[in-house]
């Protein structure tokens, strides 16, 4: 069960995943920039910006969207499969989960595919595809590319994501994008960092966690 917490921020609660099925090798499904921590309720780590009230990190894939209601109560899962592994420079993760109907939520299928490839000496590039289909209630599809490059004391990262949700309650069919780029240079006497992020007002990721829109 989730610990009760008081939310004093304007961002929604972000509770950690505790189910073993989703925890095993869950790092393969991490997308975007390396986690910097978050000041969100449910996390004890500081936010990337260092400000206590900064938004938590976006999670393109957040497994708590599967088999759990918004209140945290369980929704039955009829069946599911999950495969993770490595082959040479590639890390691959795939899952397919069928969630049972539980009024007012229709029976829903969740699919996730993540491929990441090591490049150069200490860098990686990757892609992720997500698909959620609810019987009679349309679909939500998400596709993204990401890269993290490291050259000694300099590290750079970027990602871009597009969503499509024809029956979304958001205007424009939930079709929008998010993108982020950052750099970090750290030496013994110098620390320089910067970041730029755009999150579209209609960006709609039903299998992830997005703390805010229209950034």
Annotated model-derived regions:
Residues 1-215:
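Outer-membrane beta-barrel channel domains
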